[in-house]
Curated annotation (Swiss-Prot):
Name this protein carries in UniProt: Tectonin-2
GO molecular function: carbohydrate binding
Primary localization: other
Organism field: Physarum polycephalum (Slime mold)
Phylogenetic classification of the source organism: Eukaryota, Amoebozoa, Evosea, Eumycetozoa, Myxogastria
Xref: InterPro entries: Beta-propeller_rpt_TECPR, Ricin_B-like_lectins, Tectonin_beta-propeller
């Protein structure tokens, strides 16, 4: 039997998927606060057959209420290796749990804290070993390769970067692939949208099917992609722009920044030449305490940055900066808390927030 794991919502890593206290069959599962002293009903086993079993009772498995081909709640039931097994079997892809019946659906959590089947990427949950919750963030590990800029998409299988020679690379979870083209800055969204800029300030977006770049009107020195509908950038004059997909043009945003970042949920932060930090409220910029030279936003709950000394920080509760270990010149965070960074020597590091 596999090692027990927690099932965690990345945007709320202090909560885990749990059952009702009596572990009742057909009882709904919910999101509960993480407490290392309370594990019964909160630890799960993903076995070799594809069942997600309750660690406290291996006879109970996570099931889909009414089928797996639509959104719906999850419940506990007894494993059925005949008629209903297709609703009880799961596929683990990069620690994300998809239904075997239809892998476009995955396990997630709705706004009420109920564990559901969904296609919404921002709601999906991931597997985490107990040790990874007890020590968060995890220690930085050296990763192969050299980069100046790094970006994280849907997880550790979709990481992009550029090096000091302006070469573009994509990490697919097992190795780096050099991508045709040259860039000085690159960004990838949760939905896999990739944009970059080169030293001539030209802007390009990638066709993921052909790995070919197409030019985008405008000039930028830095671009940030939350998803295909949330793209921001700054130019060499520190002017700020937001992409309008409907008109295929840029909309000027008042203010001056040297670095801007947008999450898949539309959350936007930026820093200026003085190192001041700002949060966009939809109409104007609100000052945020602290000083940074680079900032990265996955969503409103996952925001990291580095200052001019190379110190790494994460924003907690939208106002308090927590210093993390390590010294980097660039940092990025994925929707699942995947931390990637590069230092002044171009060395690459990764961790888990």
């Amino acid at each position: 039997m596999a090692t027990p794991v927690y099932i965690v919502l990345p945007s709320r890593p202090d909560h885990v998927v749990s059952t009702a206290k009596d572990h009742a069959v057909q009882g709904y599962t919910e999101l509960h606060p993480y407490d290392p002293s309370q594990t019964e009903g909160r630890l799960w086993i993903f076995d070799n057959d594809g069942y997600i079993r309750l660690a406290a009772n291996h006879n109970l498995v996570l099931d889909v209420n009414g089928g797996a081909a639509k959104e719906g709640n999850t419940v506990l039931s007894y494993p059925d290796k005949k008629d209903h097994a297709k609703n009880q079997l799961w596929v683990n892809k990069d620690c994300i749990l998809h239904t075997k019946l239809d892998e476009s659906f995955h396990l997630g959590v709705n706004d009420k804290g109920q564990v559901i089947i969904t296609q919404k990427k921002e709601q999906r949950v991931i597997l985490r070993a107990p040790a990874s919750l007890e020590k968060r963030p995890s220690a930085w590990e050296r990763h192969e390769g050299e980069l100046n800029v790094v970006a994280v998409g849907a997880g550790n299988h979709d990481v992009w970067g550029v090096n000091h020679l302006e070469h573009i690379y994509h990490w697919d979870g097992s190795k780096w692939h050099q991508i045709e083209g040259a860039a000085t800055n690159i960004s990838v969204g949760l939905d896999g949208t990739v944009w970059c800029v080169n030293k001539a300030h030209e802007i390009y977006r990638l066709d993921r099917g052909t790995n070919k770049w197409s030019i985008v009107p405008g000039e930028l020195v830095q671009v940030s992609v939350g998803n295909s509908h949330n793209i921001w950038g700054v130019n060499h004059l520190d002017a700020i722009y937001k992409w309008n997909a409907d008109s295929n043009s840029w909309t000027f945003v008042d203010g001056q920044l040297t670095n801007v970042s947008v999450g898949h949920d539309g959350t936007v932060y930026g820093v200026n030449r003085a190192g001041n930090i700002y949060h966009y409220n939809g109409n104007s910029w609100d000052a945020v305490s602290g000083e940074l030279v680079q900032i990265h936003v996955a969503n409103k709950d996952l925001i990291v940055g580095v200052n001019k000394a190379g110190h790494v920080y994460r924003l907690k509760h939208g106002k308090d900066w927590e210093k993390l270990e390590g010294e980097l010149s660039w940092v990025a965070v994925g929707h699942g808390g995947e931390l990637w960074g590069a230092n002044s020597a171009h060395n690459i590091y990764k961790a888990l927030l």
